[in-house]
């Protein structure tokens, strides 16, 4: 058979390809075409390759392009099977005068015909051809060769059909298709636009797996698209705005892409545009904000103006969408604007290396305040039936970000919304699995309807904790939160989150957000201890909380790198113990003794004696573990010392326990070994407070302090109260 006959037989694949677009059903008369039936019979009875070629050519002539339906294609497959196209794809012996790629082209054409049947597209015999098909996309050859072009078209037809099956994307990724598509696109050869379209589909279906298998190649495509975006002067820049979010990696965007992406966005957003042109640009900017923060925006005047423009546009879009009652909200666009507003909040509150100058910050805060007012207005309209909608979650998120930094403005509106926020947080807390699903849906909204973005926190309460921490200091908001049951909800939430830190969980992979959430809960409880002590005494949830603090602190203080959380737990527990001192759980039980021993460990290990060059006397210095975080720790430490001092007269067993720990003796020994000039007055006051109460509470403590030169040390440090106490019998 001649090479021309082979090419003609290949037109069967073309019939199948065109049929995949048209799919007209054969009527009963056509389905019984006697000529076609005879040729199919010949195809089934063919005894060698030459006879199969001839029969295929006859079938091609009997079936007009576009007149083949799924049933007929299946009958052709039943007659041909996979063995023949398999040989065509792998053979290295072509007829004289016929390029070997013509045989492969015919094999691919047959596969393309078969793959238009979804059942055949997922057949193992098709799936195991993925690596071979992928190599065809990047094979070198004459770009004007019709057979080669036909083979490339058929290859994309096969791969696209496989991608449309349920498990197809996974097989394509495993077969090296993503890298091949990237190389085909970057080569800009024939069919490169089809490569990009298929890449988009695979990234939409399995982003994480694509990046895991082909990160270098995908980054190369991103660099190419970014350069095209920066150079584009025509409508293609808007198309690239739609594509680029799909090609941003799940971790971080390469710095070499930052300039091109920012320049392209600046040119688009700085022009007068319709919404369909502007909205994709806002979404792309939001995705970049998620991935890079503000790192992708250049430092200097142009960068600050661009950031101000972004936040301005986002705030205007939010107000237009949420202030007009009855208008349809473009939730994906508004959610993207929320991300840009959050970027604005971060930059406005950044003290060092902020992109914004002070006048710009003042202006943006005013603009964002109006947009947050629109968000509050929207949330006040939300009924119970909408509380599980992702857009509501996104709206609560941006409000939480605002309240974390600013609670003095919009105070009346915030107080009006607080009952809703407590109910909303409680609803999602009680349905944690659905809340996690909502979180992912919100991430999808921020980017596009098809592409998942960075995960957002899975519970609304964590978003609101920083704002509630500020609000519990103020009388009005605190009363509303207490009335709506927020303290009880916070206790339950704290206990649930604490379970994640228990020995049964791998705390080495504990998300930072969990520990930060626990610390913020502690701060809220500290506010309530100080401002609403009666609540702590009467609400049973705080008794449960106290029990958890007592049983947890002993192991927590031993864990490396968790000193700040231990400080929060210790200080909160000490302050609550002072209020709950009559509770049976605090009457010298093993749990209470373990807690106070751990609290003493935290308080006693903060400072050490450190030798100084050229001096015979050491100085009081922070211990290495405390030194790096003392700025965050010192307020808790001083508060903890004060709370421990207050517990000593209320718990008779505590002074003997402290004596057995040797804390008072070691404290006096430390003070005696350092220069008094190196001990700050506030440290002297804190140490004296503890030593005086221990001495007053227990005779054995007084005797032990005297033996440790307590009176002499008290005199050196001008601790009059301690000196007087130790001088008494």
Curated annotation (Swiss-Prot):
It is found in: Cytoplasm, Cytosol; Endosome membrane; Cell projection, Dendrite; Postsynapse. A lipid is attached at residues 3-4 (S-palmitoyl cysteine). Disruption phenotype: Death between 3.5 and 6.5 dpc. Heterozygous mutant do not display gross anatomic abnormalities. They however show abnormalities in developing cartilage. Nervous system-specific gene disruption by conditional knockout results in epileptic seizure. Displays no overt neurite outgrowth phenotype. Shows a behavioral phenotype associated with a rodent model of schizophrenia, as observed in alterations in both sensorimotor gating and psychotomimetic-induced locomotor activity. GO terms for cellular component: cytosol; dendrite; endosome membrane; glutamatergic synapse; neuron projection; neuronal cell body; perikaryon; postsynapse. Expressed in the neuronal, chondral and bone tissues. Expressed in dendrites. Enriched in the brain in the surface layer I-IV. In brains, protein level increases in male but decreases in female with advancing age (at protein level). In adult brains, it is highly expressed in the forebrain and hindbrain. Highly expressed in the hippocampus, piriform cortex, septum, amygdaloid complex, medial geniculate nucleus, inferior colliculus, cerebellar nuclei and the nuclei of the Vth, VIIth, and XIIth cranial nerves. In bone tissues, it is expressed in osteoblasts and osteocytes. Keywords: Acetylation, Cell projection, Cytoplasm, Endosome, Lipoprotein, Membrane, Methylation, Palmitate, Phosphoprotein, Synapse. The modification Phosphoserine is found at residues 2, 448. Its main location: cytoplasm. One of its GO terms (biological process) is neuron projection development. Interacts with MCHR1. Interacts with SEMA4C. Interacts with DIAPH1 (via FH3 domain). Interacts with GRM5. It is a lipid-anchor. Belongs to the neurochondrin family. It comes from the Eukaryota. The modification Asymmetric dimethylarginine is found at residue 75. It comes from Mus musculus (Mouse). The gene is Ncdn. InterPro entries: ARM-type_fold, Neurochondrin. The modification N-acetylserine is found at residue 2. The keyword Acetylation applies. SUPFAM superfamilies: ARM repeat. Probably involved in signal transduction, in the nervous system, via increasing cell surface localization of GRM5 and positively regulating its signaling. Required for the spatial learning process. Acts as a negative regulator of Ca(2+)-calmodulin-dependent protein kinase 2 (CaMK2) phosphorylation. May play a role in modulating melanin-concentrating hormone-mediated functions via its interaction with MCHR1 that interferes with G protein-coupled signal transduction. May be involved in bone metabolism. May also be involved in neurite outgrowth. PANTHER family: NEUROCHONDRIN. This is Neurochondrin.
């Amino acid at each position: 058979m001649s090479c021309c006959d082979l090419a003609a037989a290949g037109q069967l694949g073309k019939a199948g390809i065109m049929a995949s677009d048209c799919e007209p059903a054969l009527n009963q008369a056509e389905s019984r075409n006697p000529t076609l039936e005879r040729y199919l019979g010949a195809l089934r009875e063919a005894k060698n390759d030459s006879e199969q070629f001839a029969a295929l050519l006859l079938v091609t002539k009997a079936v007009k392009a576009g007149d083949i339906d799924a049933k007929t294609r299946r009958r052709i497959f039943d007659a041909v099977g996979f063995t023949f196209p398999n040989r065509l794809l792998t053979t290295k012996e072509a007829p004289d005068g016929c390029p070997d790629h013509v045989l492969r082209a015919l094999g691919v054409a047959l596969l393309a015909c078969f793959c238009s049947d979804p059942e055949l597209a997922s057949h193992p015999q098709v799936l195991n051809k993925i690596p071979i098909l992928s190599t065809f996309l990047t094979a070198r050859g004459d770009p004007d060769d019709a057979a080669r072009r036909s083979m490339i078209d058929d290859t994309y037809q096969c791969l696209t059909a496989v991608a449309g099956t349920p498990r197809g994307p996974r097989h394509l990724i495993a077969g090296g298709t993503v890298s091949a598509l990237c190389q085909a696109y970057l080569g800009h050869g024939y069919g490169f636009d089809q490569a990009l379209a298929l890449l988009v589909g695979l990234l939409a279906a399995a982003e994480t797996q694509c990046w895991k298998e082909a990160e270098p190649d995908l980054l190369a495509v991103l660099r190419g698209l970014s350069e095209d975006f920066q150079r584009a002067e025509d409508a293609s820049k808007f198309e690239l705005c739609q594509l680029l979010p799909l090609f941003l990696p799940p971790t971080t965007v390469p710095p070499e892409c930052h300039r091109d992406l920012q320049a392209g966005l600046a040119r688009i957003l700085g022009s007068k545009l319709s919404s369909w042109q502007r909205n994709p640009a806002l979404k792309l900017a939001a995705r970049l904000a998620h991935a890079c923060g503000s790192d992708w925006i250049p430092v200097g005047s142009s960068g600050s103006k661009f950031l101000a423009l972004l936040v301005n546009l986002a705030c205007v879009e939010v107000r237009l969408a949420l202030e007009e009652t009855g208008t349809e909200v473009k939730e994906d666009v508004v959610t993207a604007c929320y991300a840009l507003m959050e970027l604005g909040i971060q930059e406005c509150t950044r003290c060092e290396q902020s992109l914004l100058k002070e006048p710009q910050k003042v202006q943006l805060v005013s603009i964002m305040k109006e947009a947050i007012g629109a968000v509050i207005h929207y949330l006040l309209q939300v009924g119970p039936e909408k509380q599980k909608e992702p857009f509501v979650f996104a709206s609560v998120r941006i409000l939480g970000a605002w309240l974390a930094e600013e609670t003095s403005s919009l105070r009346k509106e915030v107080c009006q919304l607080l009952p809703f926020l407590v109910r909303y947080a409680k609803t999602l807390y009680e349905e944690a699995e659905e809340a996690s699903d909502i979180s992912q849906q919100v991430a999808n909204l921020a980017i596009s309807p098809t592409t998942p973005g960075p995960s957002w926190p899975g519970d609304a309460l964590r978003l609101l904790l920083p704002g509630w921490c500020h609000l519990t200091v103020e009388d009005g908001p605190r009363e509303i939160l207490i009335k709506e049951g927020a303290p009880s909800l916070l206790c339950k939430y704290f206990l649930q989150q604490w379970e994640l830190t228990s020995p049964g969980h791998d705390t080495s992979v504990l998300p930072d957000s969990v520990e930060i959430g626990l610390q913020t809960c502690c701060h809220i409880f500290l506010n309530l201890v100080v401002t609403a002590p009666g609540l702590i005494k009467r609400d049973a949830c705080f008794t449960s909380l106290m029990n958890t603090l007592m049983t947890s602190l002993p192991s927590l203080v031993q864990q490396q790198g968790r000193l700040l959380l231990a400080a929060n737990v210790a200080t909160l527990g000490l302050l609550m113990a002072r209020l709950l001192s009559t509770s049976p759980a605090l009457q010298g039980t093993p749990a209470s003794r373990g807690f106070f021993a751990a609290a003493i460990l935290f308080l006693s290990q903060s400072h050490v004696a450190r030798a100084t060059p050229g001096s015979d006397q050491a100085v009081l210095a922070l211990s290495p573990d405390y030194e790096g975080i003392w700025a965050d720790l010192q307020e808790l430490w001083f508060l903890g010392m004060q709370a421990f001092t207050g517990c000593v007269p209320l718990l008779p067993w505590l002074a003997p326990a402290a004596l057995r720990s040797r804390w008072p003796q070691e404290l006096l020994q430390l003070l005696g070994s350092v220069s008094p000039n190196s001990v700050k007055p506030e440290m002297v006051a804190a140490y004296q407070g503890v030593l005086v109460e221990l001495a007053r509470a227990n005779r054995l403590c007084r005797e032990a302090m005297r033996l440790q030169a307590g009176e002499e040390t008290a005199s050196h440090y001008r601790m009059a109260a301690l000196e007087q106490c130790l001088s008494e019998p």
